[in-house]
Amino acid sequence: MANNNNKDKCNVPNLRFPEFSGEWEMSSIGEQFELYSGNTPSRMNKNQFDGSINWITSGELKEHYISDTKEKISEEAAKNNSLKLLPVGTFVIAIYGLEANGVRGTCSITTRESTISQACMAFTSKMDIQNEFLYSWYKKHGNIIGIKYAQGTKQQNLSYDIIERFNISYPCMEEQKKLIRFISLIDQRIATQNKIIEDLKKLKSAIIEKLY
């Protein structure tokens, strides 16, 4: 990648692959994504939480990908509560409880078909933006969005009406895919290094145990 020295273009990143040029497009979230927020099945009926369908809450959006949830619901619960079964690869953000640092700006991408609570919002791309690109964009901007735009007194929340109006800049699909691959390679390197660190910690503990 190279620094972009073209100051005449305003809607371009500061760092860019040299084979790409021209301004990025700009559009609203509402124009680019279908937005959906779920709900909570009644706990009065225990059968509704006795199933195998993932039910994502806002506190579970901690990692890049989410494959499992603490609570699971039944097909009956999904049907009775009109809960959409979101496909693999759906981008999900926390929209309730954003006064908390550990919740504000959190997001994940599903690796299994899942449902969500009303404290989450799912994004389904209509055409031009890949969810992995959106994930990186939200990781950069999500915390500030929560601080500036969440509403409420005791509990700070984001609503559909607020989210759909946010503008997002994005490149062509080819550039998006290259950016996604590049960031994925960095993530893989980080994971490898973290594994090495954990193995060294275990080795150190084993050596100390034998020495002392």
Label the model's feature ranges.
Residues 141-143:
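Conserved loop->alpha-helix
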Residues 1-22, 192-212:
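Short amphipathic coiled-coil heptad-repeat segments
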Residues 30-33, 43-76:
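DNA target-recognition patches
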Residues 9-10, 113-121, 151-174:
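A short glycine-rich beta-alpha junction/loop motif
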Residues 43, 79-80, 152, 184:
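Short, solvent-exposed loop/turn positions at domain surfaces
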Residues 57-58, 68-139:
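A short beta-sheet element
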Residues 14-40, 63, 165:
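Non-catalytic DNA-recognition/assembly elements of restriction-modification systems
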Residues 19, 27, 31, 177-189, ...:
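Extracellular/lumenal glycan-associated surfaces
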